[in-house]
Amino acid sequence: MLFMHIRTRFAPSPTGFIHLGNLRSALYPWAFARHNKGDFILRIEDTDLERSTQEAVDVIIEGMTWLGLDLDEGPIYQMQRIDRYHEVVKQMLDSGLAYPCYMSEEELNLLRDQQMANKEKPHYNGLWRPEPGKMLPPIPEGVKPVIRFKNSIGGSVIWNDAVKGQIEISNDELDDLVIARSDGTPTYNFCVVIDDMDMQITHVIRGDDHVNNTPRQINIMKALGGTPPVYAHLPTVLNDSGEKMSKRNGAMSVRDYQKAGYLPDAILNYLARLGWSHGDAEVFSKEQFVAWFDLESLGRSPAQHNPEKLLWLNHQYIQNSDPDKLAEATKPFAHALGIDTESGPNFVQVVGLLKDRANTLIEIAEGAKLFYMPTPNLSDKQVRENIPETVIPALKDLVGAISSAEPTKEGYAAAFKQVLAQHQLKMPALAMPVRYALFATTQTPAIDSVLVVMGRDEAIKRLSKVIR
C-alpha cells in the first residue's frame, strides 16, 4: 500500500464572525493532519467581494491562533488565484467541458416559474448546451454569457463519506453548474475544485451543509482528470435551543468567549467533544486529542451546544492550571478592573488561592479585587453589626497568636485552633468577624490561606483597627 501524505484544509468565507461551530470545522481537519503528520492549510474563500474584508480574515486567524491551531500553509486567498481560475475556465471551454450560456436572469426566472407551476423541481433546461446535431439559438447582442460546466447526463455520483457512509446522487438532479459569472468572476464550487486539486488536498472535513455541493465538485474534478479527496461531512452544531448555531440565532463569537474569561484549551476540549468521542474521556489535553483523533470516531447525529458543560470544563481547566500561567492569563482581566497586580500581595499567590472556586478568569479577577483594595474604613455601626463585642477579646488574642505563628497555612490554622480552644468558640464565630475586619465582607476563601497571601503585617494592621 502506498503511503499517502495527508493534506487537509479549513476554507472559511470571511464574514467577520466566527462561532464555535465554525471553529470545530477548523479543529477536526487540523487534528487529523497533526495525527497523521500531514499538512493543514488555511484557505480564505473570498470571491464574495461584498462580504470579504481583511478585518474579517483577521478575526478567523485570531480565533485559530488563540486555540493553537497552527498552519503549515496559508492563509491562501482565492482572489489572488483569479488568473489560475480563468486559465482553467479557458481550458474547459477549449476542450468542450464547459460552454457559454446567454440565458438572461429574466429568462431563468421565467423558466423557474413555469417549472414550479408544473410542480417540477426548478432546473436549467440546457438551452445553450451544445450537443451533436443540436442547433443553438442565435447569440443575442450585448449579452455577456455565464460559463456552465457540461455535467454528465445519466448515471450517478457515488462517494463513501467518512461520516455519513455511501451517498449516491443522480446526475439528473444536477444542473450544468455555472462556473464563471457574466463578469468573469469564478463561482464558489468551481474555485473549491481547482484549489483542492492544486493544493493536493487528500481529505475534506467540513460541515454537512456542503453535502449538496459534493457531487458537483466531484464531477468537475473527475472531468479535469483529478482524483476526489476523502469527504467527511460533520453533523450540524445546534445551539442550546436546538436551532442551527449561527450569529442570527444568538451564537457567541469566539472573541466573546475570550472576553468572558474562557481558556483556549478548555474551548478546544469542548469543541473536540462536539461530534467526536474517545470512550468516556471528558477532560483531555490537546496532545491527547491529537493522539486519539480519527475519522471513524466522528458522530453522525447533530451535536448540541451545552453552555453549562462548557463552563464546567473551563472550571476544570482553571482548577488544574499552573498558577504562574493562570496568573498571566488573568492579568488583563485584573487590569481592566483597575487592579495594580505589581503592588500589593503576590498576584500568583492570589490566583492560586482563588482558582479552585472560579469558573472563568473574570471570576478570578473579581475575587482578586479584595486583596488590592485599600484597608476598609469601617464605621462604628458596621463594626457593631458584624463584629460582636463578645468576640473582641478573642480577636485580641488572635492578633498575638498570629504574630508569633509560622507564616504558613498550617501555622495560621494552629493559631486559630489555639484561640478557639482558649475562648471556647466555634470556627465561624471567629472566622466571620476576622473576614469582615480584613475585607468588609464575610465571603472569602479559607481564612488561613487568606492570611498567607495577604501577609501577616497587613492582616494585623487591619485587625488592630477594630479591636482598639
Swiss-Prot record:
Disulfide bonds: none
One CC-aspect GO term: cytosol
Chief location: cytoplasm
EC number: 6.1.1.17
Protein localization: Cytoplasm
Motif 'HIGH' region, chain ranges: 12-22
Keyword set includes ATP-binding: yes
Motif ('KMSKS' region): 244-248
Top EC class of this enzyme: ligase
CDD domains, sorted: GluRS_core
Amino-acid positions noted as binding ATP in the UniProt annotation, renumbered to this chain: K247
Chemical reaction(s) catalysed: tRNA(Glu) + L-glutamate + ATP = L-glutamyl-tRNA(Glu) + AMP + diphosphate
Keyword Transmembrane helix: no
GO BP terms in the entry: glutamyl-tRNA aminoacylation
Superkingdom of the organism of origin: Bacteria
Keywords, ordered alphabetically: Aminoacyl-tRNA synthetase, ATP-binding, Cytoplasm, Ligase, Nucleotide-binding, Protein biosynthesis
One GO molecular-function entry: glutamate-tRNA ligase activity
Matches recorded under PANTHER family: GLUTAMATE--TRNA LIGASE (PTHR43311), GLUTAMATE--TRNA LIGASE, MITOCHONDRIAL-RELATED (PTHR43311:SF2)
Main function: Catalyzes the attachment of glutamate to tRNA(Glu) in a two-step reaction: glutamate is first activated by ATP to form Glu-AMP and then transferred to the acceptor end of tRNA(Glu).
Family assignment from sequence similarity: Belongs to the class-I aminoacyl-tRNA synthetase family. Glutamate--tRNA ligase type 1 subfamily.
Record text on subunit structure and interactions: Monomer.
UniProt protein name: Glutamate--tRNA ligase
Gene that produces this protein: gltX
